[in-house]
Amino acid sequence: MTQPIARSIPLQVVSGDTAAPAPLQTGVKQIGGDKINRSPVQFVDAPVLRKPSWIRVRIPSGNAVQNLKAKLRENRLVTVCEEASCPNIHECFSHGTATFMILGEVCTRRCSFCDVAHGRPKPPDASEPASLAATVADMGLKYVVVTSVDRDDLRDGGAQHFVDCISAIRTSSPNTRIEILTPDFRGKGRMDRALEILALSPPDVFNHNIETVPDLYPNVRPGADYQWSLTLLQRFKAQHPSIATKSGIMLGLGETMEQVQATLRDLRAHDVDMITIGQYLQPTPHHHPVMRYWTPEEYKALEDYGNALGFSHVASGPMVRSSYHADRQAAGAGVAA
């Protein structure tokens, strides 16, 4: 089942300024080509790789998925499962679980791997924390994951809105465990402000994804910084030693085993407790191409490597995502639901 690295794929990185993208309008989503055309990089001449047998998504029957979608729309809530085109959406929705995305559906970043829309976001919805808390209570969730788009337009990066959501959930569902998956709060003074605000009502698990190895950041995460993300994770852990920290990395963007192992060592050196490792899947032809499909044996090797480094929980597999079975991941790390 081994698969060689596709070293011959002719990946070319070119300026994203060759085509005039649609103008930004507040609250209007730019997706696919419109989004990536605004990116500092575009990818051309990379052939589409055939998905191997181990990349399979189970689509369950029944009305659970549609019922949950109706409940979300009724409460004007958004899930990252839908906005980011997660391959596990049918499985999670059929079990009544979802990762809620706050602060709107429009991101200020243009990461080449992500299917969330880019644009000029609207101001935060002041009613969202109450709506989210009501939905969590109505669904009877014992564990909830709350994430957001990047909000570089906000002075605190959206930290206060996270706290408002955490507080609202704790009020209506005091026994529910809360994991937040945050942006990097990058910008002058923004990390300081965000950490100060998050300390007012911290979550049970703090998650921020490193996403890829440092050498690939310019192409994969333009606008982000590898060391900044590591520092955010370490500083939160230093302020809250008893709260589990978590991060995630995608494979298949052109990284090597040695680079992935080095990134895992960096995460442990910055006091990250939990790690998720999964296969990158290209959401549209405009996005970063899949350079290689890593094998199940390689994921198992990385799981063993992560355990040897001392992570409290390692979730490593082709279909693993940051919030996929997050409750089980947290339980494996000692966070009781």
UniProtKB/Swiss-Prot annotation:
GO terms for molecular function: 4 iron, 4 sulfur cluster binding; lipoate synthase activity; metal ion binding. InterPro entries: Aldolase_TIM, Elp3/MiaA/NifB-like_rSAM, LIAS_N, Lipoyl_synth, rSAM. It comes from the Bacteria. It catalyses: [[Fe-S] cluster scaffold protein carrying a second [4Fe-4S](2+) cluster] + N(6)-octanoyl-L-lysyl-[protein] + 2 oxidized [2Fe-2S]-[ferredoxin] + 2 S-adenosyl-L-methionine + 4 H(+) = [[Fe-S] cluster scaffold protein] + N(6)-[(R)-dihydrolipoyl]-L-lysyl-[protein] + 4 Fe(3+) + 2 hydrogen sulfide + 2 5'-deoxyadenosine + 2 L-methionine + 2 reduced [2Fe-2S]-[ferredoxin]. Pathway: Protein modification; protein lipoylation via endogenous pathway; protein N(6)-(lipoyl)lysine from octanoyl-[acyl-carrier-protein]: step 2/2. [4Fe-4S] cluster 2 binds at C107, C111, C114. SMART domains: Elp3 (SM00729). Keywords: 4Fe-4S, Cytoplasm, Iron, Iron-sulfur, Metal-binding, S-adenosyl-L-methionine, Transferase. One of its GO terms (cellular component) is cytoplasm. [4Fe-4S] cluster 1 binds at C81, C86, C92, S323. Its cofactor is [4Fe-4S] cluster. It is found in: Cytoplasm. SUPFAM superfamilies: Radical SAM enzymes. Disulfide bonds: none annotated. Its EC number is 2.8.1.8. NCBIfam families: lipA, PRK05481.1, PRK12928.1. Belongs to the radical SAM superfamily. Lipoyl synthase family. This is Lipoyl synthase. The gene is lipA.
